[in-house]
Amino acid sequence: MIHDYHITHFLISVPAVYCLPNEKIGMEVAFVGYSNSGKSSAINALTYQKKLTKVSKTPGCTQLINLFEVSPGIRLIDFPGYGYAKKTKKRKNYWHDVICEYLKKRKNLKGLILMMDIRHPIKDLDQKTIESALSVDVPVFTLLSKSDKISRNILQVTSKKIIHDMKMMFETHIQVEPFSVVKKYGIHSLKRVLNNWLR
């Protein structure tokens, strides 16, 4: 099914998983990743709306789960980033733990978009997030954000290495795509994956 992401609008912000809308109604895809990995920017690029989600240059600023509605019953979930270094270990892991709870409990979740800075790939909490998703058969699409920050040659080599490392690490194929809001890498692939999941 082809969705019109241009008309996506803000729905609600909630502080916890139990505050999310009734899971028996509709379908959703979640955007997750480390603080400042580009989740909000990816949603803005997907929807061609520069101000749909607030993009903060200060990591760890967002502390609410933001929901956006593509069409009635079709939602995108923007989770706060995990692993912000200036927080205590408990706080650094807090949103990762919330995401794992969400993965286990949310029956209408159709897939996970994992934003990963291509310059710092497959960090500890990213690995644990993928493992949690795979354990409950939730598909993962990894976007290598900030791909415009490195040269095209390094981008190709790094992307291949990440794909290889993830296949060895998880013993299965994880979809991986370079992504850049600036150079428009990966936006069409993101739409294709979302349309496939949300049908």
Swiss-Prot record:
It comes from the Bacteria. GO terms for biological process: division septum assembly. GO terms for molecular function: GTP binding; metal ion binding. InterPro entries: G_ENGB_dom, GTP-bd, GTP-bd_ribosome_bio_YsxC, P-loop_NTPase. Its cofactor is Mg(2+). Mg(2+) binds at S40, T62. One of its GO terms (cellular component) is cytosol. Keywords: Cell cycle, Cell division, GTP-binding, Magnesium, Metal-binding, Nucleotide-binding, Septation. The keyword Magnesium applies. The keyword Transcription does not apply. Residues 25-199 form the EngB-type G domain. Necessary for normal cell division and for the maintenance of normal septation. Belongs to the TRAFAC class TrmE-Era-EngA-EngB-Septin-like GTPase superfamily. EngB GTPase family. This is Probable GTP-binding protein EngB. It comes from Blochmanniella pennsylvanica (strain BPEN). The gene is engB.
